[in-house]
Amino acid sequence: MPLLMDGLAYAGAIWSLIVFCVQAIGLYQLFRSYSRPPPPPVSPSLTSEDVPHVTVIRPVKGLEPRLYECLISTLQQSYPRDKLSVHLCISSKEDPAYPVLKKVVVEYSATHDVRLFVETEDPLLYGTTGDTRNLGPNPKIRNISHAYREAKGDIIWIIDCNIWVSKGTAGRMVDKLCGFPAGSRPYKFVHQLPLSVDVTPPQDSGVLRTGGGRLDEMFMATTHGKFYSAINTVGVAPCICGKSNMFRKSHLDRLTDPAHNPILPKETATRPRGIDYFSAYICEDHLIGDLLWRSQVPGHGNHGLVFGDLALQPMMNNSVGSYIARRVRWLRVRKWTVLLATLVEPGVESMVCCMAFAHALTTTPWCPNPADWPIPHTWTALWSIWLAAIAVWATLDYVVYHFLHSCRSIEKDADSPDFAQGNELMKRPFGAWILAWIGREILALPIWTRAVLLGTTVTWRGTKFKVRPDQSVVDIPNAGAKSNGIGSTNRKVR
């Protein structure tokens, strides 16, 4: 038993130090990159023939908070208008968000290339020549498939409907993707750091009824922000969120063809190409990024995080239950895509990591003579060190949370919404902040347990799916939506 305890203590020491180092890298990168607005992009200032054309695809489902402001943010980009096409996508005209999309099209169609795509009017799926079985069950892919096929130019920017971006974002993402200015390294895939902002009015607040937004913004601005930045700084593995991603259509079309990509199984030759290749999967954002990461494109880097630009997601009236359900879904759809990272995730949370650190300091004989070690091997010492480590962790989270929510890196102007201003309106009293921090930390392990160990189904965009070990999904009939029959014959992508 002493050998076992010593082994656990040594493992805890190594693990906690690794986590502390990763956090340090993330904190350094956050403060280095988000302290001021990034420099103006290069690509918009090139000659007209040298400016790459960008097709922005925005999938929409339901009335998201501040939907109008989020959608028009891509129409207010400083990128040349004749080089920017915006495709708004919705499942049907019965969707409550449809009038908002129509309003955007009416207001901007005279000056911008903006189009509205309705899934039920997609000739690939409906009409005399269509068949709903031509695509898998993924509702997001089915939503944007037509817009992707109609894309102008080669660059695709998929950005969720509930994301707001500043005016220079398109240009800086193109710079990163294409390697501007000349001599810079181009990438296969670029993305942004996501950040949630709860815009629920104070008079509508209630812990269980609206506290989910506070928990979500706490997660995104602390644990997620630190590790997302660190992993993308080191670049040892793909780490993407899927809120705002840019890549080349030519790359994705070619790399989803087994005849041109040897890492794909030959049996996938009958699948459609491009974005449609991933319609059998619920975790399409990660799988697209993963495929581009693992596929050879000479002269290109794998993934590039566009440091300095934030993808802001306003949230409103989200219950604690909805936060838990969203986190469970997030973990379950990624369980089989990044299994190792999912299994070790509890160890990067404050409660577990600090306990491993405290156990290591109060258990292992770090000196030949135990009497020379200044920390006693007692329960009192263990809990004291744990509390001290938690306090330091919370202090760092408090600092980085307020730093990110100050929105210092955002180019502010008259068109910037209140949630992007970083002003007093969005600041939280310390009491409210610490309650949200404690709540998120306490919920982390139960959420992980429920997601990873206690189920394989997720509900997304009104449809219930079963997630399989080969990363494919099948929609479950009689669970809110009619099954389209796709999913049972899907093979592995990776």
Curated annotation (Swiss-Prot):
Chain ranges for the short sequence motif D2 as given in the UniProt record: 160
Motif D1 covers 95
Q: Does the record carry Transmembrane helix as a key word?
A: yes
Q: Which Pfam families does this one have?
A: Glyco_transf_21
Major localization class: Golgi
Q: What is known of its domains?
A: The D1, D2, D3, (Q/R)XXRW motif is a critical part of the GCS active site, involved in catalysis and UDP-sugar binding.
Q: Per its database record, what is this protein's job? A: Catalyzes the final step in the biosynthesis of the membrane lipid glucosylceramide (GluCer), the transfer of glucose to ceramide. Glucosylceramides play important roles in growth, differentiation and pathogenicity.
According to the UniProt entry, what is the EC number of this protein? 2.4.1.80
Q: Where are the transmembrane segments?
A: 7-27, 338-358, 381-401, 429-449
Where does the record say this protein resides? Golgi apparatus membrane
User: Could you cite one Gene Ontology molecular function of this protein?
Assistant: ceramide glucosyltransferase activity
The Swiss-Prot or TrEMBL record describes its family as follows: Belongs to the glycosyltransferase 2 family.
**Bilayer disposition of the protein:** Multi-pass membrane protein
Q: Which residues lie on this side of the membrane: Cytoplasmic?
A: 28-337, 402-428
Q: In which pathway does this enzyme or protein participate?
A: Lipid metabolism; sphingolipid metabolism
Provide the protein name.
Ceramide glucosyltransferase
In its UniProt record, which GO terms are filed under biological process?
A: glucosylceramide biosynthetic process
Catalysed transformations (reactions):
an N-acylsphing-4-enine + UDP-alpha-D-glucose = a beta-D-glucosyl-(1<->1')-N-acylsphing-4-enine + UDP + H(+)
